[in-house]
C-alpha cells in the first residue's frame, strides 16, 4: 500500500484548539512494505514536518515552536490489520505519545509523563478527537533514551534490535491488547522512535534499508548521531562557506573518533536540521574547500593515532 497523506478536516477543524488545526497524518503500512515504500514514507514525513522556507547548505530545517500545525501524526499499519498512531512534535519530531484502537470502538491514548500542560491536552484530543470513545492508558515514565533503556532492561540501545519486522511484531503486542508490561511497551517505543531518527538522518534511513529483511543492532555511529543532532544542526547553521565554526567530534560506525570540519563531510548523513534561529548560508563554493579537506584528513589521522597510543 502506497504511503499516503491524509488531511484531517471537517468537524475536527472546528473543535480542535488553534495549535492543532489541520494536523496531518502520514500513513505507513509496516505489514506489507518495501524499501521503496519505506523511502517514500520518510520523504512524506520530512516534507510534512520541515519549514518550506528554511534551508542551510541545501538541508531542510524544521520550523520553530510557533509554527502551525504544531504536530504530525504517523499511523503505522501492522499485520493482521493492527494499527498504532504516533504523535510527533513538528518542530523536533519527538514522540509525545501514541494511540491504538481498543475494545472494538474505543480510542486508547498513551502519553509520556514528561508531556504536560497544554501539550498534554493536545495529545489527548489530537490522538482521540471523540471524547465519548476516549480511553486513557498513560505511559508512566518519561521519553528520554536512558529511561527507555532502563525499562527494557539494557545498558545501551546498542543491545536493542531494530528493523521493520521488529516494528511490525511490536505493533501486534500493543495494539488492542488489554494488558502489556512496561518492558514490552518500552521495546516498542525504542523501535518506533527510530522513525523520527531515520527522518532526521539519511545515514539511519540507509541502515534500515541495508538491513531491510532482517533485524539489526544500531552501530556506534547511529547512536552518536542520535545524541548529537542538535549540536550537528547548530554547527551546520553557523558554518561559513561550508567550514564549521569549530571541529565537531563525532564517532564513526566502528566507534573511532570522527572529526568533522566541513559541511560536505556530514551533509550526506543529514536529512533534517533541528531549528536554529538566525540566517545561514544556503550554498557554498566547493572549490574553496580543498585546504579544509587536507586539514580534516590530518585531524582524523591525529585523533585516531592518539587513541592507538593510549592502548599501549
From Swiss-Prot:
Keyword Acetylation: no
Residue ranges of the propeptide: 284-312
Matches recorded under SUPFAM superfamilies: Ribosome inactivating proteins (RIP)
Disulfide bonds: 56-280, 107-128
The enzyme's E.C. designation: 3.2.2.22
Family from the record: Belongs to the ribosome-inactivating protein family. Type 1 RIP subfamily.
Protein name: Heterotepalin-4
Amino acid at each position: 500500500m502506497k504511503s499516503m497523506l491524509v488531511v484531517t478536516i471537517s468537524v475536527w477543524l472546528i473543535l480542535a484548539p488553534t495549535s492543532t488545526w489541520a494536523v496531518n497524518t502520514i500513513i505507513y503500512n509496516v505489514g506489507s512494505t518495501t524499501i521503496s515504500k519505506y523511502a517514500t514514507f520518510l520523504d512524506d514525513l520530512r516534507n510534512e514536518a520541515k519549514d518550506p522556507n528554511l534551508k542551510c547548505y541545501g538541508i531542510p530545517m524544521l520550523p520553530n515552536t510557533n509554527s502551525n500545525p504544531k504536530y504530525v501524526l504517523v499511523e503505522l499499519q501492522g499485520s493482521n490489520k493492527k494499527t498504532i498512531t504516533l504523535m510527533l512534535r513538528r518542530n523536533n519530531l519527538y514522540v509525545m505519545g501514541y494511540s491504538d484502537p481498543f475494545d472494538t470502538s474505543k480510542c486508547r491514548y498513551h502519553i509520556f509523563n514528561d508531556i504536560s500542560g497544554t501539550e498534554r491536552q493536545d495529545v489527548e484530543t489530537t490522538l482521540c478527537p471523540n471524547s465519548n470513545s476516549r480511553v486513557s492508558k498513560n505511559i508512566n515514565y518519561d521519553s528520554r533514551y536512558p529511561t527507555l533503556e532502563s525499562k527494557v532492561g539494557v545498558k545501551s540501545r546498542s543491545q536493542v534490535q531494530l528493523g521493520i519486522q521488529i516494528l511490525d511484531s511490536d505493533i501486534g503486542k500493543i495494539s488492542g491488547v488489554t494488558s502489556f508490561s512496561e518492558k514490552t511497551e518500552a521495546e516498542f517505543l525504542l523501535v518506533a522512535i527510530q522513525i523520527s531518527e531515520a527522518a532526521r538522518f539519511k545515514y539511519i534511513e540507509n541502515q534500515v534499508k541495508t538491513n531491510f529483511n532482517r533485524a539489526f543492532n544500531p552501530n556506534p555511529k547511529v547512536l552518536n548521531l542520535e545524541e548529537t543532532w542538535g549540536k550537528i544542526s547548530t554547527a551546520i547553521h553557523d558554518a561559513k562557506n561550508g567550514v564549521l565554526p569549530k571541529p565537531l567530534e563525532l564517532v564513526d560506525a566502528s566507534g573511532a573518533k570522527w572529526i568533522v570540519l566541513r559541511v560536505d563531510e556530514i551533509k550526506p548523513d543529514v536529512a533534517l536540521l533541528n531549528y536554529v534561529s538566525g540566517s545561514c548560508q544556503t550554498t557554498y563554493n566547493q572549490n574553496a574547500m580543498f585546504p579544509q579537506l587536507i586539514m580534516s584528513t590530518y585531524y582524523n589521522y591525529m585523533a585516531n593515532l592518539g587513541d592507538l597510543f593510549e592502548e599501549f
